[in-house]
Amino acid sequence: AHILGIKDMSGLIKPMAAKKLIEALKNEISIPIHLHTHDTSGNGVATLMMAANAGVDIIDAAFNSMSGLTSQPALNSIVAAMDSTERETGIDPDGIQEISDYWAAVRPVYAGFESDMMTGSAEIYKYEMPGGQYSNLKSQVESFGLGHKFNDVKDMYKAVNEMLGDIVKVTPSSKAVGDMAIFMVQNELTPENIYEKAKDIDFPDSIVSYFEGMMGQPEGGFPEKLQKLVLHGKKPITCRPGELLPEEDFDGIKKLLVEKYGLEGTEKEALSYALYPKVFEDYLKSLDKEGNFRLMGSDIFFHGLSEGETCEVKIAEGKELVVRLSDVRDADDE
């Protein structure tokens, strides 16, 4: 091994725990230690500083304007706090402030995608939900018409995790837990009644895939009774899922993309298709039908032009279009 990475995707490691962990590891191994965490609890900066004082080699942090909550702890604040200490970073505070200011101006453009989480929440220690999932779960719950039961879904997330054996929750296993939690709230299921009420119910694809072994084998194995209920007699795999994949025909994919879509057949295009064939084909169809929206400013793409507003669209090197919305009228009969 060249490096030891500690991925705390839910931001569960507390400051003193980080100190103890890093000190213990430093006493046993000589390779660099890299700590990744999230700031959902509000303790992220303290956690990284304790880890730094214990000798961690690498930490992940985010520019202040993009930090906190389900993101990473605040880089600018850490740099300032470590100034004039043994672990001084050497990072120019003015330089990173300039970059942070840039992202502070960009962020409002994407405000529609922000979670409505306004403050850190120590309840993350209760639910153990990854940062990225925590920020997306509410909109997912609302899409099922269960927004008024969001707290019930969070409680069920914890219950499902315990039903599965307190598993490592990171994509895709965290999605399986979340989907199962929503499914159980939807169908008024509980850990106690699920074996009777869900005998003939089709479970979410993600939880079926989990119990099939397609996400790997969890430490301690699967809970057999629940596995049998979910799979309805289907036999799970016991090997590494990747061993069952057929050899990918990349030359064939490149030929398809060239002949069907007129692409260059680059390695990047072939990999995109191999990983997400439907998503990539839908993207190509969108380009063909609607054009390349990447040429348009994000604010215009999301919100459109206001009357009298002008935007510039660079469609090629040295070729720029100026678009102005003069006015908006009701459509006529034709």
Label for each model-derived stretch:
Residues K7-G11, H36-G42, N64, A122:
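Active-site beta-loop-alpha junctions enriched in small/polar residues
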Residues I6, H34-H38, A61-A62, G90-D101, ...:
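Beta-strand segments within the central parallel beta-sheet cores of soluble alpha/beta enzyme folds
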Residues D39-A51, I58-A62, N76:
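Thiamine diphosphate
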Residues A1-I33, M49-V56:
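Alpha/beta enzyme core
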Residues M118-S121, E128, G132-E334:
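Terminal or standalone catalytic/regulatory effector modules within metabolic enzymes
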Residues A46, S71, A80, T89-L146, ...:
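Core active-site phosphate/anionic-ligand binding loop and the adjoining beta-turn-alpha structural block
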Residues D8, A54-S71:
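Glycine-rich phosphate-binding active-site loops on the catalytic face of alpha/beta enzymes
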Residues I22-S30, V79, D83, A104:
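Surface-exposed amphipathic alpha-helices with a cationic face
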